[in-house]
Amino acid sequence: MVSHLKKTRKLRGHVSHGHGRVGKHRKGGCRGGRGKAGGMHHHRILMEKWHPGYYGKLGMRTFHLKKNPLHCPVVNIDKLWSLVSDATRQKYAEDKKKVPVIDVTKAGFFKVLGKGRLPNQPVVVKAKYFSKTAERRIVAVGGACVLTA
């Protein structure tokens, strides 16, 4: 017999609604718990298969270690122009009124040392530290040394 009512309408008034007797189809017991329940226990195999490394610790927390206070990456003046593109260098070589600014701290260096030679082109160099020879050679080509924090 065809009926226009859905099954849920027919089951109104019947306690179990077609899902058996006591405790069936209710709450989280019929599906192994709710949410992330049992990840260390009855769902462990699935957790290890699909989410490896979810549980447990890895590595050490080093509260007692301090970062090296003497860490000071250096660059020599003969490598200064390698931090600037060739097009920029040509642009400033043609226009004598403007001077390029090279910030070595953006390239990851803290100190500028004086090994090598600079081309005879003025340049402004920004760094945390300068050696005496580096400062002397930069000023000799008409440049300037700017200290940054």
UniProtKB/Swiss-Prot annotation:
Pfam families: Ribosomal_L27A. It comes from the Eukaryota. Keywords: Ribonucleoprotein, Ribosomal protein. Residues 1-29 have a biased composition (Basic residues). One of its GO terms (biological process) is translation. The keyword Ribosomal protein applies. SUPFAM superfamilies: Ribosomal proteins L15p and L18e (SSF52080). Residues 1-38 are annotated as: Disordered. One of its GO terms (molecular function) is structural constituent of ribosome. GO terms for cellular component: cytosolic large ribosomal subunit. Belongs to the universal ribosomal protein uL15 family. This is Large ribosomal subunit protein uL15.
